[in-house]
A protein has these predicted regions:
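Structural motif
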Residues: 16-17, 55-57, 97-102
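A short beta-strand motif characteristic of beta-propeller blades
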Residues: 23-30, 64-70
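Short, well-ordered strand-loop elements centered on a beta-strand within folded domains, enriched
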Residues: 65-66, 87-89
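Beta-rich, blade/repeat-based domains predominating
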Residues: 1-14, 29-46, 51-53, 73-87, ...
């Protein structure tokens, strides 16, 4: 659910992420295959994790350009956005690790 209460839909195999704009679902720029989690911060930026690629992206709310925050994990699963501390708490389930990922890049 985004900041306006709209649903966000991820296509696990195709890698598309759909968000509601002007009453219609529209894809964000980029491909996020294996998307597992999505969250939106107070500035409207999106964070998407990919279980299959072990990557987490930050997607700019205006330009929709994506920045890799972390990659090379065995499996980037659901995460917890701790915006007041400027981080995501991210489990790598396959490796048995939890990472604190800086979101202010």
């Amino acid at each position: 659910i985004d900041n306006s209460g709209n649903i966000m839909v991820g296509s696990f195999f195709l890698g598309n992420y759909l968000v509601k704009r002007d009453g219609r679902l529209s894809p964000l720029k980029g491909q996020f295959r294996g998307a597992d989690a999505v969250e939106q911060d107070s500035k409207g930026n999106y964070y998407v994790s990919s279980w299959t690629s072990g990557t987490v992206w930050k997607i700019d709310s205006i330009t929709e350009e994506s920045t890799v925050l972390i990659d090379g994990l065995q499996s980037a699963a659901d995460f917890y956005l701790e915006e007041d501390r400027g981080r995501l708490l991210l489990p790598d389930m396959m490796a048995g690790m939890i990472y604190a990922v800086d979101i202010d890049r």
